[in-house]
Amino acid sequence: ANKRPIWIMGHMVNAIYQIDEFVNLGANSIETDVS
């Protein structure tokens, strides 16, 4: 079988406290906006 990874991204995580929120919602990757 050709297995591929599935990414559930937490989009626009802009504060440390949001990481736990997105992970608790099922995210297994985090995307941040840095400026």
From Swiss-Prot:
> Which keywords does UniProt give here?
Cytolysis, Dermonecrotic toxin, Disulfide bond, Hemolysis, Lipid degradation, Lipid metabolism, Lyase, Magnesium, Metal-binding, Secreted, Toxin
Active site, renumbered: H11
Q: Which InterPro entries match?
A: PLC-like_Pdiesterase_TIM-brl
Subcellular location, record wording: Secreted
Recount the PTM note. Answer: Contains 1 disulfide bond.
**What is stated as this protein's family in its record?**
Belongs to the arthropod phospholipase D family. Class I subfamily.
Descriptive protein name: Dermonecrotic toxin LdSicTox-alpha-1
Question: What is the species listed in this Swiss-Prot or TrEMBL entry?
Answer: Loxosceles deserta (Desert recluse spider)
